[in-house]
Amino acid sequence: GFVKVQTGCLMGDLNKELEKYGRELRLLPSTWKTATIGGFIAGGSGGIGSIRWGFLRDPGNLIGLEAVTINEEPKLLRFDAQESEPLNHAYGTNGIITSLLIATDIKRKWYSIIIDCEGLNKTIEILKTCTTAAIDLKLGAILEKEIVDQMPTWFKGKSKSHKILLQSTLGGIKTIELICKKYGVGSFLLGQEDKLTNGISEVV
């Protein structure tokens, strides 16, 4: 599915509206609750969902846009996906984007999982194993322990370790637990992401 939206729309509001139709945005920055969709397209590159859908500039994510030229006599122009590429991640330097046509995904219930790991090489290996497993993932990210130390208490917990952040559908949780067991590491299920007061969507 697709959605046509004006660039000043907040991504958090847009996602709520899409939920009414069983859809959601494919890609989100960590600032998705307060960022505008136009700002994300003009200055962003990827984020939550990139493990699944790649980056904003990858074919299929931005379907088209409208922009006003920045010359003496401004004109409103419409661009298809290929024509939109020069304006994608151009910070508005070659035109003022006024509306976007972007691809959406089926709305799923995503569950947030944190895995504690000691060695960085092992941490990378575990994440690679998770990304190649037959599970639906929306997020797969590593935070080194030095970064974790700067995080809020609710997130970093008591163990000083590297952390893998995952968002998976309910069906993938058991597989992730089995992978953790295989590598001898612990994991913690935070819960369904959109019902959490504090979720990992705000820390990546």
Residue ranges and their predicted role:
Residues 2, 108-112, 161-163:
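Short, solvent-exposed beta-strand edge segments and adjacent coil->beta transition regions
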Residues 3-5, 73-78, 152-153:
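Short, well-ordered strand-loop elements centered on a beta-strand within folded domains, enriched
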Residues 4, 116-117, 166-170:
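Hydrophobic alpha-helical scaffolding
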Residues 8:
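Extended, alpha-helix-rich binding/interface surfaces that flank or overlap catalytic cores
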Residues 11-12, 16-136, 140-141:
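FAD-binding subdomain of flavoenzyme oxidoreductases
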Residues 128-204:
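C-terminal substrate-recognition/cap domain of FAD-linked oxidoreductases
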